[in-house]
């Protein structure tokens, strides 16, 4: 079947937009093909700085013919309805319609509409210009004299040419005939801007990709990345160094070049006195270059790797010299900033926070730092941290935000705080907390383990969460401007991965007490709402680890479950138990008991609380179940008190035979009202016994 080749050739597309633009082009074209009844075999999109390209293979040469029966008005119906039917179906008279006879509903007119399929080439010529005009660039522009006319094309950068061909692999393809803003689609594209700028005539994708390669254009972004990484590693290795890989920078650099040429430059070793992260940020942010390390020392080497977009006649000497000149100036600035920062102690910067507002309803940064310091000191004994060191770390943790280096490179906040703290003689734990209190900042980020860092990190995140909850600035839908979901996940990971035992409600209460803001929610409602938010985040966390979200609901339904470590352990034990036959059957029996109770409680408008009366037991199965509940309840309660949830589940399993026998032999809704009530109370005892670990009614299945 025929294939489509489409290329949109323009001025340089920003690197950050290329991947999404390629995917958007693929999606828009293939979605429209499917909507037109043209099911394709495969599609792949590509992007370079100067072009978006798409190949779709295995497209039918034409649409299938369609036959449709459209039911009309009743025979003898109103004239207006009949005329509307004729107009909608394109029939000239009722003689062209058939009559469908229905003994019950009567006779109706039916139009048989035959719609011949169109040639795919015509469909493409109609749909492609619409896709170009409606392309979803995040930012676009108009250009030239045509920009003054109504309906002028908007594109990310001036669009120069469109290549569009369609045909079989064994035949000469057809040009898809259309134009956009005076740009006619054709078979012509262009090579590298400097090394092969001449026009190139192409026929289909294989021919197109090969000719571009000859014209110094690597079409596939992944191939450009592979070239950059391979050549950079080899170049570094040849000099005795190792490439410091940077996937984000690699994505960007591969979008800046069509023909990657890797070169190495150098800088004065004197600049290595500046922290490595600052050197890397300087070279990366300003010149989009990679740094290299010396494997002998593990530190950075006074070299950098750049990616040019041309094979220079002088072997790249001029390009290297230009980059060295700029990097020298930037590193000189960074060194000056760093040395200037070292002249001022961190605590001497703190008064400036009095003039910086954290949030209009939550006060200044100075007030926030004071709250974090107080809360961290309260958390310290709960996590085994030294109280004095924790208070000192919390006080200094934000100070580097006012330094010159962090002002220039915000991505090194915290890290620079650590360096400055060490430089002024602070304890190692205090310095580490200055960096680590921001962590973890994402699912793949490292979780601090030093108790001082953990205490400050918890205080920082909980102050943020409680503060924004108090002023009713909670996340809604997809909106989370203050990254509160990330903060909650950070708290969860800090607690669970460090096996910490603490009452979340108690700590949140301390954070709320230190706020001194008027909240629209009372403390109890705020705490309950916040705990529910943590439950939702914990479900997300555990689901990613393969756990069931309903088990989290079942544990939180017990109420007062603010010890997240114990929640996780209950969920783990419950999950393992429910994988066994005993667990599955006990769940079924417990849910059956809960369902019967729900129906009867609704019917009688009352709860069946209280202990059953042993004198009203009529059957051995009732007595056996009552005995089993008593024994299991005691055994499970003892195990839960010891926080041995696996043992509690093992005890629960002993209920299974008695529950199964009860439902097999006992009629719950006995004709005798007293016996019925007693048996319903016995069912309630099953529910209460299993609640030692979780609310089984919340578990699916």
Curated annotation (Swiss-Prot):
The keyword ATP-binding applies. GO terms for molecular function: arginine-tRNA ligase activity; ATP binding; glycine-tRNA ligase activity. One of its GO terms (biological process) is glycyl-tRNA aminoacylation. It comes from the Bacteria. It catalyses: tRNA(Gly) + glycine + ATP = glycyl-tRNA(Gly) + AMP + diphosphate. It is an enzyme of class 6 (ligase). Its EC number is 6.1.1.14. The keyword Ligase applies. InterPro entries: DALR_anticod-bd, Gly-tRNA-synth_bsu, Gly-tRNA-synth_heterodimer. It is found in: Cytoplasm. GO terms for cellular component: cytosol. Pfam families: DALR_1 (PF05746), tRNA_synt_2f (PF02092). Keywords: Aminoacyl-tRNA synthetase, ATP-binding, Cytoplasm, Ligase, Nucleotide-binding, Protein biosynthesis. PROSITE patterns: AA_TRNA_LIGASE_II_GLYAB (PS50861). NCBIfam families: glyS. Belongs to the class-II aminoacyl-tRNA synthetase family. Tetramer of two alpha and two beta subunits. This is Glycine--tRNA ligase beta subunit.
